[in-house]
Regions:
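Cytosolic ends of transmembrane helices, especially the final helix of ABC transmembrane type-1 domains
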Residues: 8, 115, 135-138, 162, ...
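ABC-type nucleotide-binding domain
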Residues: 253-496
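Hydrophobic alpha-helical segments in the permease module
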Residues: 1, 91-93, 164-175, 184, ...
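Pre-NBD coupling/linker segments of ABC/ABC-like ATPases
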Residues: 243-255
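Juxtamembrane loop-to-helix connectors within ABC transporter transmembrane domains
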Residues: 7, 27-71, 128
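Transmembrane-helix motif of ABC transporter permease domains
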Residues: 1-15, 86, 96-97, 197-198, ...
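Loop segments that connect adjacent transmembrane helices in multi-pass transporters
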Residues: 20, 24-25, 29-39, 111-160, ...
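Transmembrane helices of ABC transporter permease
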Residues: 1, 61-111, 184-195, 212
Length: 496
């Protein structure tokens, strides 16, 4: 009991440390290493529990008993003479039987874990796209996929349980057979006068004790295979490329002025063949306000992600205050850039939680100031819980325009010197957008602003305009001159 308790305590401590380290690696991983399916990735993390179960299993204590089996064999040889050959022969036969079952079980468990990841991915995708399924009338199609996946998984689990049961019962049979053989052989030795009854009883008890650990180890076979595969996936998670490299010593820049230079950068998303950006060059002085327009898929949002250091350019440089972006600590960088993405979800929690995300220390006065500026204060006034109003998972309890207002308020909360706004009003109505634009006009003065938009009215916030098309800058200059060139067809297409 004490041994099992100590193992369980050690396993719990190991679990806490490993799970914390694992989550740290996940949140710190490079966006290039982000998995294609969230569900399968989540299942891999969930399977980590199987590793802890294996390490804390009571049957794992049987491994400690194995060395004592050799000592018991010596004792049987001393008191029972030739009877020692029965457990000596049964021991390797039992081990060989368990090993053969383990080989058959390995492939089954591996396929089972893969199907489990597919099922988890299917479930998460279904829950996230439930409205889409209902709108398209595709519930039955998804139901069929679920039944097929779950049915295959059930069959594999049943086969794995059968093999595990075969290993356990087969080992038990060999134990009992060895015990019977010991008694039968011992009787003949007693008749011949070469063994006493007491020695036979002792040999029988010691022989059973020798084979007992093998019976317990047979019960570990299934857990071992799951733990082995889980360890492989855990190793892959721990090896994920990180944003912060241990050998790097980033520069500490707690206050940036906002001068920005993009030098001939090119970028291709992982797993894609076509480049998203090709030979992009732009230069902004501190406090300059640039609007970026272009058709969907032209690379505007990709450029914003590179500026936030979510990804690194394959070629070229991005300089901020004459320093390469890769020399700056990503936390310091993002702390000084107000970023809004058109498809960025909110997190489950309250309005206050999302407004002050990453800046819980901010004062209520500052929070109210940006809430007034962006119109978020109206969301609090309209609800009896005020700023404790729940927003739901991914902000589903708010409209698209309301979510964008919250995101914009959060971007302005720390009064950053640089703003990167990617379609900040795409889901807002005209009235809300006009009111927000009027309030922002004074606030953005003196700040470096990069505004990506399809709304012509929002361009009143910028003095300069660049046009992206198919990953290239096809126009860059004063706003009025670029708009005039677009009207006359002297530059590539843009979406406004």
């Amino acid at each position: 009991v004490l041994r099992a308790h100590l193992l369980d305590t050690a396993g719990k401590k190991t679990d806490v440390v490993l799970s914390a380290t694992l989550f740290e690696r996940i949140t710190g991983m490079s966006m290039k290493a982000r998995p294609a399916t969230v569900g399968g990735f989540a299942q891999s993390i969930h399977d980590f529990q199987g590793l802890r179960d294996f390490l804390t299993a009571v049957t794992l204590t049987s491994l400690i008993d194995l060395p004592f089996s050799l000592l018991m064999l010596l004792v049987i040889g001393l008191i029972g003479g030739p009877l020692v050959f029965i457990p000596l022969l049964a021991f390797p036969i039992t081990a060989l039987f368990a090993y053969v079952i383990q080989i058959r079980l390995r492939d089954t468990v591996q396929k089972s874990l893969q199907l489990g990841s597919q099922r988890q991915a299917l479930l998460i995708e279904t829950l996230g796209g439930l409205e889409t399924l209902k709108a398209c009338g595709a519930e039955s199609e998804r139901q069929h996929q679920w039944e097929q996946t779950h049915g295959a998984l059930t069959r594999l689990d049943g086969h794995a349980k059968f093999l595990a049961s075969l290993a356990t019962n087969g080992t038990l049979f060999l134990q009992q057979f060895a015990g019977m053989a010991t008694i039968v052989a011992g009787v003949y030795l007693i008749i011949a006068g070469n063994l006493s009854v007491g020695a036979l009883v002792a040999c029988y008890m010691l022989g059973s004790r020798i084979l007992a650990p093998l019976g317990q180890i047979a019960g570990l076979i299934t857990r071992y295979q799951q733990a082995r595969l889980t360890m492989t996936s855990t190793d892959a998670l721990m090896a994920l490329p990180q944003e912060r490299q241990d050998k790097q010593r980033p520069l500490d820049r707690t206050q940036l002025k906002g001068a920005l230079e993009i030098r001939q950068i090119s970028f291709t998303y992982p797993g894609q063949n076509a480049p998203a950006l090709t030979n992009i060059s732009l230069r902004l002085g501190a406090g300059e306000r640039l609007g970026i327009i272009g058709r969907s898929g032209s690379g505007k949002s990709t450029l914003a992600r590179l500026l936030m250091a979510f990804y690194s350019a394959d070629e070229g440089q991005i300089l901020l205050d004459n320093l390469d972006l890769r020399q700056l600590d990503v936390a310091d960088l993002r702390h000084q850039i107000g970023y809004v993405a058109h498809d960025l979800p909110l997190l489950a929690g309250s309005l206050r939680d999302n407004l002050t995300l990453g800046a819980r220390y901010i004062s209520d006065a500052r929070m109210l100031e940006v809430a007034e500026l962006t119109g978020v204060v109206d969301l609090a006034r309209q609800h009896p819980q005020g700023f404790e109003r729940p927003v739901g998972e991914r902000g589903q309890l708010l409209s698209g325009g309301q979510r964008q207002a919250v995101l914009l308020a959060r971007a302005l909360l720390l009064d950053p010197p640089i703003l990167v706004l990617d379609e900040p009003t795409s889901a807002m109505d005209n009235t809300s957008e006009d009111l927000l634009r009027q309030r922002l006009h004074k606030w953005v003065q003196g700040k470096t602003l990069i505004l990506i938009t399809h709304r012509a009215s929002m361009l009143s916030l910028v003095d300069r305009l660049a046009v992206l098309d198919n990953g290239h800058v096809v126009a860059d200059g004063p706003k009025e001159a670029v708009i005039e060139a677009l009207r006359k067809g002297r530059v590539g297409p843009a979406s406004l």
